Amino acid sequence: MLDVIELDFDYHDQPLLQQISFHLPAGGLLHLKGSNGAGKTTLLKLIAGLLNPEKGEILFERRSIKKDLCTYQKQLCFVGHRSGINPYLTLRENCLYDIHFSPGAVGITELCRLFSLEHLIDYPCGLLSSGQKRQVALLRLWMSKAKLWLLDEPLVALDELSLLTIIRKIQEHRAKGGAVLLTSHQDLPLNKADYEEYHL
């Protein structure tokens, strides 16, 4: 599904990423690892088409993402380290913000029950805790029909039950042929044989 080929990226004229290459197949999960400042978030932004590399190529389904960036970006969902939640909109409004990209998506109330948030569905998100805001960002992810999930530290600020919920949803996405690329300082609660790791 996704091929990153000999990617280079400079930050302030200094090399940050060099010769990055990997393949992420449909149904695959790749855990990006590295110390703070290693370029994990930058690499996700490059793959999302938000930054341009100095060298190298990114292919999605064997086609350069540069060929039709807009169409490519409709097939991915990027949840950054920050939640990206509008504090002035309600939980429901935040989740439905991009609903035109995902016709036929599962109902918002049903998804809210996964995190026991249904009683907060019409609360402004500015009143939610950091963990709850993170959960709302993940609900938006699950409402999308994106094939490729790019997740930057998705396990941050989640309790154990929420962590197990997101792992289950990731596995369900993979079982349907989707692919997941994530960063995390935490070890994933999965068998090591069930996913790949890439160290920056």
From Swiss-Prot:
InterPro entries hit by this protein: AAA+_ATPase (IPR003593), ABC_transporter-like_ATP-bd (IPR003439), ABC_transptr_haem_export_CcmA (IPR005895), P-loop_NTPase (IPR027417)
GO BP terms: cytochrome complex assembly
Listed GO CC annotations: plasma membrane
Record has Transmembrane helix as a keyword: no
Superkingdom, natural source: Bacteria
Keywords, alphabetical: ATP-binding, Cell inner membrane, Cell membrane, Cytochrome c-type biogenesis, Membrane, Nucleotide-binding, Translocase, Transport
Keyword RNA-binding set for record: no
Domain ABC transporter: 2-200
EC number: 7.6.2.5
Compartment(s) where it occurs, according to its Swiss-Prot or TrEMBL record: Cell inner membrane
Membrane topology: Peripheral membrane protein
One annotated GO molecular function: ATP binding
Amino-acid positions noted as binding ATP in the UniProt annotation, renumbered to this chain: 34-41
Pfam families: ABC_tran
Subunit annotation: The complex is composed of two ATP-binding proteins (CcmA) and two transmembrane proteins (CcmB).
Function noted in UniProt: Part of the ABC transporter complex CcmAB involved in the biogenesis of c-type cytochromes; once thought to export heme, this seems not to be the case, but its exact role is uncertain. Responsible for energy coupling to the transport system.
UniProt similarity note: Belongs to the ABC transporter superfamily. CcmA exporter (TC 3.A.1.107) family.
Family matches, as PANTHER family: ABC TRANSPORTER I FAMILY MEMBER 1
Name of the protein in question: Cytochrome c biogenesis ATP-binding export protein CcmA
